[in-house]
Amino acid sequence: MNVLICDDDLKIVQQIKNFLLKLSKQSTYNFDITCFSNGDSILDKQIKTDFAFIDIEMPGVNGLSVTKHLQTLNPNIIVFIVTSFQGYLDLSLIHI
């Protein structure tokens, strides 16, 4: 499975990557992981990926724009939105 991780916080990128590598060792899943530190570097590439972990708030191109781009390349992609901003959590809880 191809997995993309995009976050401007490199600690978060490493934590997600380590989690996936550990999961890969404990199961039959084999992850091919590609990491980016900003959305700008993704928009000019034709990356087809099965799963993506994307920070919603990054300098330059934000996570929503990256998600839309990746969905044009693979409409079946599964995207996990990552954020450390409390405001986004508050907004999402309103809709539960």
Predicted regions and their residues:
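Active-site residues of response regulator receiver
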Residues: 7, 55-56
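Acidic, metal-coordinating helix/loop segments flanking the phosphotransfer/catalytic sites
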Residues: 32-51
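Acidic catalytic/metal-coordinating carboxylates
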Residues: 38, 62-65
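The feature encodes the CheY-like receiver
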Residues: 59
